[in-house]
């Protein structure tokens, strides 16, 4: 998880998540953390299952999204994905006001993956309209399930 000086100023992940509080609240996440002798709670970032659980937990905690993150596919790092969308939002804010007043922001995520991370975040957090496309039938099926599970299927079409 990239938590550094290059994070967007409005990115809540500029301050690292509190793994200890997350472990108390989310029992699935608790299974993947260990407390060291100083009391610091740590996650094994080399473990794909731990990373998938971290992503799932952050989706729920910070965006109220219930997302299946298969540990066998690409596991999105939410801080960097949100960072990208915040920079896009900044770019959109530079457009003349009359160009953005009546226009709805629409985006296309080519290769959306199983989590459909950009469409889910853009729709839920920013209120944008997104289309996700995916070549892998397995990833597309999971992406569609993730969109439907969050009752966004009318707002986030997904296709091959």
Where are these regions (language model features)?
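N-terminal auxiliary segments of SAM/dcSAM-dependent transferases
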Residues: 1-75
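Conserved alpha-helix/loop element of class I SAM-dependent methyltransferases that forms part
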Residues: 53, 57-61, 79-106
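Gly/Ser/Thr-rich loops at beta-strand to alpha-helix junctions
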Residues: 74, 80, 112-116, 137-138
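Conserved class I S-adenosyl-L-methionine
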Residues: 100-113, 129-131
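Glycine-rich phosphate-binding loop plus the immediately following alpha-helix
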Residues: 125-127, 131, 136-139
